[in-house]
């Protein structure tokens, strides 16, 4: 089966077919190229996906990824990154082993095809030229024969005519002979050209064309084989990465099998364990008995002297409920009056209604009375320190000793801080050793440097080490203090704590026992000696650095108000004061007389003029 013998007359169709074969090969190259682009795009998307879900450094997410399930997820992301790398390998191998190779082969194929069809067209043109020569000699031979016949007939006619001279007859005879000779020459030439054409035609159809078509056939078959080999390479490139992709998938399975739910549960305990003991039983409060209270100075003095107030606010049973009390609620209990404001006096006389028909002095809420008694004892200092620490936490300030955290979390933070400081100390010590060695080298070889130039740096490093050690001792002391307070402390510590509780009146040590402030922050627990040594000035100093609330306007007292309840302030008719808090709907306005004296007055007793800028802000 040969194109040279079977398709000897299909030159044009073979030319079209071979061009179609090259187009198919180029189309396959384009297909592989688009596949490589898809692989690269897919790999890029996988990498971006893996990067997107990676935990951010120095963020809360990084702390959350300590759980085994999250670690498995990280392993999944890493394996996905490697998986994406294999798709990049597929793209690279296809580009180098298929696209580049086939593109070069297509150029060679086009050149070979062009050469073969050029030879075919050249042979075709040659046979066409021979055919034209044959046709030309044939027409000339035919013309000469006709001319010879006419000359012979003319001679015979002249020879038969008796009226024609002998000279004319001779001339006609010579002309006939010339034409006859020309016909013979044309015949010989035609015969020669015909033989030559037949030979060329035989060579063309039986030698040249078969050889050229055979080359074209071989070229086309090589193209087909090359395309098949490229398809095999295409599959092999994919097959080569399958084992590595399998390892990636095995890694994902292994990471999934490493998930330990029990370990994660333990980590949750370590992350959120507060170290507090569950609250005790709430004592029964009998409201059937009349509550005898007095707010006179004598009763308050007696309460402080005896250390036995009527009610135990913040005792052990209620102290455990501190974590569930909102800070703003506590502040309102401490500062805002708990009675509705009195109506304005019926007459313009300031003495007409001194305190109003519903003055807070006449009736008190039990909770307000408890706070009144609570505020007259020294433990208020610690409670307000706890409150201040909670407020500072809400404002974003974190105490250095992490006292805003529950005991267990505070212990972990302190331990972490101690470890960090120890690492810094070790780093500074290594630096000091390096400087010392360099100084020794300078001492032995003065030409290398001046030893005295390192003294300043050595002193600076030593000073840093000393500072870090002092800092470490401070945090270690806090850590030891916290570890001594955790529920798992020794029996001796428990006995000492019980002795301490029994030696202090309930009202005095209530706030000291409660280690959690109203916002859930952890506060310091003072010993008995420090409790007895605290002076009233300590409480004032504790809040000296608190900035007063800014004034939002002014007010003028319309009537005289004698504020005799906690949180209120006395005003005189016509007095001008600063407004620091508007009426929140309870009928009271918070005002300030100077930097140290402020409180609430009934809104109906004053004429308020708010500053426009402050109101807008």
UniProtKB/Swiss-Prot annotation:
GO BP term, example: signal transduction
Region entry Interaction with PDE6G, spans: 495-617
Ranges where the record places region Interaction with RND2: 400-552
Gene3D superfamilies: 6.10.140.470, Arfaptin homology (AH) domain/BAR domain, SH3 Domains
Any single Gene Ontology cellular-component annotation: intracellular membrane-bounded organelle
Segments crossing the lipid bilayer: none
Residues annotated as site: Mediates end-to-end attachment of dimers: 166
GO molecular function list: identical protein binding; lipid binding
Coiled coil: 67-259, 398-490
Modified residues (Phosphotyrosine): 500
Function: May act as a link between RND2 signaling and regulation of the actin cytoskeleton. Required to coordinate membrane tubulation with reorganization of the actin cytoskeleton during the late stage of clathrin-mediated endocytosis. Binds to lipids such as phosphatidylinositol 4,5-bisphosphate and phosphatidylserine and promotes membrane invagination and the formation of tubules. Also enhances actin polymerization via the recruitment of WASL/N-WASP, which in turn activates the Arp2/3 complex. Actin polymerization may promote the fission of membrane tubules to form endocytic vesicles.
Protein name: Formin-binding protein 1
Species annotation: Homo sapiens
Lineage of origin: Eukaryota, Metazoa, Chordata, Craniata, Vertebrata
């Amino acid at each position: 089966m040969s194109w040279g013998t079977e398709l000897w007359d299909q030159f044009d169709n073979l030319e079209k077919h071979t061009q179609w074969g090259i187009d198919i090969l180029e189309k396959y190259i384009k297909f592989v190229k688009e596949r490589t682009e898809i692989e690269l795009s897919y790999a890029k998307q996988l990498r971006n996906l893996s990067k997107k879900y990676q935990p951010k450094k120095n963020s809360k997410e990084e702390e959350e990824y300590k759980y085994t399930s999250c670690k498995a997820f990280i392993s999944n992301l890493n394996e996905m990154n490697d998986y994406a790398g294999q798709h990049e390998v597929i793209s690279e191998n296809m580009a180098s082993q298929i696209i580049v190779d086939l593109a070069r082969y297509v150029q060679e194929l086009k050149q070979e095809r062009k050469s073969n069809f050029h030879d075919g067209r050249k042979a075709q043109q040659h046979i066409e030229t021979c055919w034209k020569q044959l046709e030309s000699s044939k027409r000339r031979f035919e013309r000469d024969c006709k001319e010879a016949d006419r000359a012979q007939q003319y001679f015979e006619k002249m020879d038969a005519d008796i009226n024609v001279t002998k000279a004319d007859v001779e001339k006609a005879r010579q002309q006939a002979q010339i034409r006859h000779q020309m016909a013979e020459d044309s015949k010989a030439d035609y015969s020669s050209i015909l033989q030559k054409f037949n030979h060329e035609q035989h060579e063309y159809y039986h030698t040249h064309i078969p050889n050229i078509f055979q080359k074209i056939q071989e070229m086309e078959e090589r193209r087909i084989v090359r395309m098949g080999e490229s398809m095999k390479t295409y599959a092999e490139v994919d097959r080569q990465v399958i084992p590595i992709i399998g390892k990636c998938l095995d890694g994902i399975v292994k990471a999934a099998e490493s998930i330990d739910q029990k370990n994660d549960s333990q980590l949750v305990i370590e992350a959120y364990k507060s170290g507090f003991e569950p609250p005790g039983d709430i004592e029964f409060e009998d409201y059937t008995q009349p509550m005898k209270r007095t707010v006179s100075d004598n009763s308050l003095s007696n309460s402080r002297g005896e250390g036995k107030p009527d009610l135990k606010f913040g005792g052990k049973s209620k102290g455990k409920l501190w974590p569930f009390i909102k800070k703003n609620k506590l502040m309102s209990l401490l500062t805002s009056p708990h009675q509705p404001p009195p109506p304005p006096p019926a007459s313009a006389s300031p003495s007409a209604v001194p305190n109003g028909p519903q003055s807070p002095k006449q009736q008190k809420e039990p909770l307000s009375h408890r706070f009144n008694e609570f505020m007259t004892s020294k433990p208020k200092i610690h409670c307000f320190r706890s409150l201040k620490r909670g407020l500072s936490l809400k404002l974003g300030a974190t105490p250095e000793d992490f006292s805003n955290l529950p005991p267990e979390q505070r212990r972990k933070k302190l331990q972490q801080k101690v470890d960090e400081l120890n690492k810094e100390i070790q780093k500074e010590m290594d630096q000091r050793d390096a400087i010392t060695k360099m100084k020794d080298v300078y001492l032995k070889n003065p030409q290398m440097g001046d030893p005295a130039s390192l003294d300043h740096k050595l002193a600076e490093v030593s000073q840093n080490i000393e500072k870090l050690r002092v800092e470490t001792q401070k945090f270690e002391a806090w850590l030891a203090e916290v570890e001594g307070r955790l529920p798992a402390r020794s029996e001796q510590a428990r006995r000492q704590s019980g002795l301490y509780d029994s030696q202090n009146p309930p009202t005095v040590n209530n706030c000291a026992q409660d280690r959690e402030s109203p916002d859930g922050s952890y506060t310091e627990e003072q010993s008995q000696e420090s409790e007895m040594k605290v002076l009233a000035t300590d409480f004032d100093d504790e809040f000296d650095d608190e900035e007063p609330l800014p004034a939002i306007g002014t007010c003028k007292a319309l009537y005289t108000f004698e504020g005799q309840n906690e949180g209120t302030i006395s005003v005189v008719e016509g007095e001008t004061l600063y407004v620091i808090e508007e009426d929140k709907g309870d009928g009271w306005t918070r005002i300030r007389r100077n930097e140290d004296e402020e409180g609430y007055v009934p809104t109906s007793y004053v004429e308020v003029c708010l500053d426009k800028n402050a109101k807008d802000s």
